[in-house]
Amino acid sequence: MAGKRQATSNLNHENWDLEEEPEERGTFRTATEEELKTRVIKKARRKIAGGSSAAEEDGAEEKTAEPKSVFSGFSGFGKPAASPAAGSPFSFLANVTAPATTSSSEPKKSAFSFGFSSSSSSADRPVSTSICGTASTSSTAPSPLPAKESTSTVDGAKPTTSIFGNISAAKKESSEAKTSSSSTSLTSTMETSEYRESVADLNRSVIKFLQDQMGKSPYCILTPVFKNYDEHLKDLQDEESARTNSTKSKTAQARSQEPVAKVSRASSPPKAATTFTFGKPSAPIGASVSPLAKKPNCTITSGGTTTTTATPLVSFGSTASFTAPVPSSSSIFSLTAKPTGEAKSDDTPKSSIFSFGAKDTTTKKDEPNFSAPKTNGFSFGLKSNNDDKPSTSLFAGFGKAPGGAGDGAKGFSFTNSATPFSLGNIHPPAAAAAPAEEEKEEDTPPKVEFKQVVEDDAIYSKRCKVFIKKDKDFGDRGVGTLYLKPVKDSEKIQLLVRADTNLGNILVNLILSKGIPCQRMGKNNVLMVCVPTPEDSKATSLLLRVKTGDEADDLLEKIKEHIK
């Protein structure tokens, strides 16, 4: 803050009450031209990419150059290098070659006239070429609506077709000649496209007309233009609705003439059973099936053997109506229901690697002599009937009872057993009980220990809480022990209350004499009106609170007994 104005005088404790000299305020004045010439005036300038240097800019201060665009350094908004000269947005219509007419010097007129009349006669103007392809014959009177197609022409002039070929008599005749359903839909699509292109041509004509009129006079009133636009658009919509109605009637006639195809149910093949059925009973063999419901059999490959099955391998709650052949090998996850037919020892499927909740019902007789003991990789809470065989699994099971003689082959057992790696029911050693009790003792907060100051010559003592009235409410002074002790060289009794602290501060210190009011108050309180300590100047209400009402009665009796 180098430019901050400094204090003109020093203000301290010696001259703070002295009057300051009034400060003369100056006035702003305009500097002369000579002073301005000597000053250096700097202006902030924007750095432009590819611009001139700072020296050139300083020299060009007096020149009023055109301001450059902020985005002049950005080439994205620039025009392409080989772009042609900018022209009218509808310049593509200038290259359209109009058909030959009887006179080469005849001017052309748009088919859509927006309320602007011409002074030329009907004999001087032939049929013109329309952008939207509607042939018209010009007349002297202004026409608010576009001229319809006319059969009569002037001077033998033929009506010209549209440059877009939208309204063509040949197309209309060909579309009316078709009667099939496919040709009818194609014709309706063409007619819809014709309607859209007609509306687009109408919009282009309006925009071109508006641009021409705005170029001549920007103050012209355009209300007649939009009125004529509404009329032209309504005519196009009426024509389109007429085409749509005729197309619908032709389609209805074509459909009424089509023969109705009949499908015989008896000739259809029976429906094949699906591979996966969820809660749906299988249909009995030989039942009639819809011809559209035919589905191929599902082929299931397991290893190198391909087996085509007609019954579902995975069935949830469904019951098969006939005995299905048992596959050679079962699935890794066995979720199939047990077939109703009797299973032989040779056809018994192998046990699943992961079996969730399935009970092993195989007996010792059905097992071959050369086969290894069948065990599950992971068995969750299962009980096997083969208790006499050891478990060869790396993980012997979670919550499964041990096998008996083969306990040594177990890797980890999460059961209540005596193995070294037992995580089932871990019993802590007995020696750890003592440290646990010590930790509990350490968690308890330490009690405040203090040495109570005891009055040896006291004839009565009682622990109480002292309240002294200040203004309108009682204030807590503290908890202590009340003592009644005789005064030396006197028959009077001293009432002393010491706080339960190491210092034993005196809370109440007075002599019991006649005239001190004392009474019971509340449930367990004794009220006295006295001077609590010699330091107090005036008497106030003193409230002594004990634990029970009996103790309060006993305390009141002792105090009244020793008042003399």
UniProtKB/Swiss-Prot annotation:
* Compartment(s) of residence: Nucleus, Nucleoplasm; Nucleus envelope; Chromosome; Nucleus, Nuclear pore complex
Among the GO molecular function terms of this UniProt record, one is: chromatin DNA binding
Which InterPro entries does the record associate with it? Answer: NPC_Nucleoporin, NUP2/50/61, PH-like_dom_sf, Ran_bind_dom
Its signal peptide is: none
Matching Pfam families, A to Z? NUP50, Ran_BP1
Question: Residue ranges under compositional bias (Low complexity)?
Answer: 77-92, 110-123, 177-192
According to the UniProt entry, which residue ranges have a biased composition of type Basic residues? 39-48
> Its topology with respect to the membrane?
Peripheral membrane protein
Entry GO terms, CC: chromatin; nuclear membrane; nuclear pore; nucleoplasm; polytene chromosome band
Which intervals hold domain RanBD1?
455-564
Q: Where is the composition biased (Basic and acidic residues)?
A: 24-38
SUPFAM superfamilies cross-referenced by the UniProt entry: PH domain-like (SSF50729)
- sequence repeats: which residues? 77-78, 114-115, 164-165, 278-279, 316-317, 356-357, 380-381, 398-399, 474-475
PANTHER family with a match to the protein in the record: NUCLEAR PORE COMPLEX PROTEIN SIMILAR TO S. CEREVISIAE NUP2 (EUROFUNG)
Q: What's said on domains?
A: Contains FG repeats. FG repeats are interaction sites for karyopherins (importins, exportins) and form probably an affinity gradient, guiding the transport proteins unidirectionally with their cargo through the NPC. FG repeat regions are highly flexible and lack ordered secondary structure. The overall conservation of FG repeats regarding exact sequence, spacing, and repeat unit length is limited.
Record function comment: Component of the nuclear pore complex that has a direct role in nuclear protein import. Actively displaces NLSs from importin-alpha, and facilitates disassembly of the importin-alpha:beta-cargo complex and importin recycling. Binds to transcriptionally active chromatin sites when located in the nucleoplasm and is involved in transcriptional activation.
Task: Kindly provide the name given to this protein in its UniProt entry.
Answer: Nuclear pore complex protein Nup50
